[in-house]
A protein has these predicted regions:
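Surface-exposed, interaction-prone regions used to assemble/regulate multi-protein complexes
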Residues: 1-130
């Protein structure tokens, strides 16, 4: 998914009550120096039923891989006992991990909104799910 590898993502929000993690690549505006059409929208990566997060706050381009085998030992119980999915997040040559029920990736043009605050919001398009 080339859209994820060419953008900067930030941990945008996390809610303990719903174990919901939002990672966002924020849209840019035409008056910004480095604007182009590929930045005309936010890209939100929403992880639900999150039980483990190992990420820096800023990621320069990402690749998300669901690990089905060769799972690091420290995550075996999450997978075997609880049925969670293990996601490896690759960014700038490093690997990070999120253990969660699933994820969804959506595009939107929300300015001061997100699905942490309003779960009824609908993305303009969904570009990935686990």
């Amino acid at each position: 998914m080339n859209e994820l590898t060419n953008r900067v993502f930030k941990i945008w929000a996390y809610t303990v009550s719903h174990n919901f993690l939002l990672i966002r690549s924020q849209m840019k505006f035409p008056d910004q120096e480095d604007w182009n059409r590929s930045y005309a929208y936010n890209i939100d990566i929403e992880f639900s039923a999150v039980v483990y997060v190992d990420l820096p706050t800023i990621l320069n381009g990402i690749v998300i891989i669901e690990l089905l085998d060769n799972i690091p030992e420290k995550f075996q119980d999450f997978k075997l006992k609880f049925g969670h999915k293990i996601f490896e997040i690759k960014s700038s040559g490093n690997s990070y991990y999120i253990v969660a029920g699933n994820y969804r990736i959506g595009k939107n043009t929300w300015l001061n909104k997100d699905r942490i605050i309003d779960m009824n919001l609908e993305h303009d398009s969904i570009i990935g799910v686990s």
